[in-house]
Amino acid sequence: VTTRRWSGTSDIGGLHEVRVDVASDEDALLVCGQTGESSRWLSVERIADPDGNIAMKWQDWYDVPQVLTGAIFPSGKDTCLNWPVRAEDGPLDPGVWTVSLATTDNQNQYTSGTTLDVVAQTRVAPGDTGVLRVALAYAGELSEEPDLVAAVDEAILRWADIWAPTGVSIEVETVNVDLGADLPDLLEGGDAWTRAAAQTDDNDMLMVIGETIDGSTALYGLSGGVPGGLTAGPRAAVAISWLANAGQNGIFDEDEIQLLGDTLAHEAGHFAGLVHPVEDSWEQWDALSDTSECGRRVTCEDDLADNNMFPYPLCDRSACEPQGALTEDQAAVLRRYTGVH
């Protein structure tokens, strides 16, 4: 993976153009931007190929029933775009690609003169298989809990089994981060997450095991972006609550380890660019052709409940249903993530 960094400001129209030279043997591009200015938000306006053709613009994906990427939505002080997402979005032709980042205020009005830092990463095409490197951290003193560590180790095997048919394997290395067991809100992000991500290699996805997330026992896990960034940023991580996955007694049994493994794969899938095949409004779907566009809860649970990216686990008082399936189009999105190499 080749990493390049810039700093700059948005122009009078609220845009900052990032030009990335893609080599002939490279097939994926990840651009992430962030700003430290208060009341400023980042999103991707558009991406253009070396001939100047618009490959994607936000207007085509903002107010439609399908979701391609979270990059176009101004939801925080950082944003990331991985390109291409689908087969029809590619290939990534060699030459200079231009990604236009937009800076806006909390009224969604463009702002000029906003300072931002940008990282662009490209990868050499790995073929039909690849590896996602994971920097795994335990918050607080959780690494000293042997039963928890053993449960996480088993859950990682479940995650690996879910991803194995996609051709993507995972390589896990344990790292240390300075975060308390109650993890900060990852959707809001912040300096604590930036500092944590700075402890990892620029090619690794940071995954942090905490007890709770922002005080909640109802959140199984969160991804800081769809997709997320590999370099340090205010949301460049995946957060996992072991307590939410372990159930009321806080002790992992076999079914709860399965749930934890499904959660790890689900949130890492978001980080690599996968969206839910259907949102729980039953009125919005992913942009992939081989997932059902069901329109009612009962139909969606029949069609998609075993899918790893279904928006929620299906549980009764004794156990949760396995959610380990991924379609070929979903698998291809994983393989196109720049962090898979």
Q: Where is each model-derived feature located?
A:
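Noncatalytic modules at the cell exterior or secretory-pathway interfaces
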Residues: 26-29, 84-108
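Beta-sandwich interaction modules
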Residues: 20, 65-93
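Active-site-proximal segments of metallohydrolase catalytic domains
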Residues: 167-255
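Exposed low-complexity, polar/acidic, P/S/T/G-rich flexible segments that act as propeptides
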Residues: 105-142
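Acidic, Ser/Thr/Pro-rich low-complexity intrinsically disordered segments
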Residues: 5-63
